Amino acid sequence: MKANEIRDLTTAEIEQKVKSLKEELFNLRFQLATGQLENTARIREVRKAIARMKTVIREREIAANK
């Protein structure tokens, strides 16, 4: 999901997606530890997506304080 697509969502929707991505990241790390993970690049993709969403949330917080 691109940053522009994330900006179209409400803050509550973004927070919900962050929560689900964190759960997915936990599961991916668990699979990695047990040797079941085939696509290791997915961990990086999920981490980057979480960072993008948190960045948009922070941008909104800063804009609201001005």
Curated annotation (Swiss-Prot):
Pfam families named in the record: Ribosomal_L29
PROSITE patterns: RIBOSOMAL_L29
Molecular function per GO: structural constituent of ribosome
GO CC terms: cytosolic large ribosomal subunit
GO aspect biological process, one term: translation
Keywords of the record: Ribonucleoprotein, Ribosomal protein
Gene3D superfamilies found in the cross-reference section: 1.10.287.310
Family in the record: Belongs to the universal ribosomal protein uL29 family.
PANTHER family in the cross-refs: 60S RIBOSOMAL PROTEIN L35/50S RIBOSOMAL PROTEIN L29 (PTHR10916), LARGE RIBOSOMAL SUBUNIT PROTEIN UL29C (PTHR10916:SF0)
Subunit structure: Part of the 50S ribosomal subunit.
Identification of the protein by name: Large ribosomal subunit protein uL29
Protein species of origin: Bacillus subtilis (strain 168)
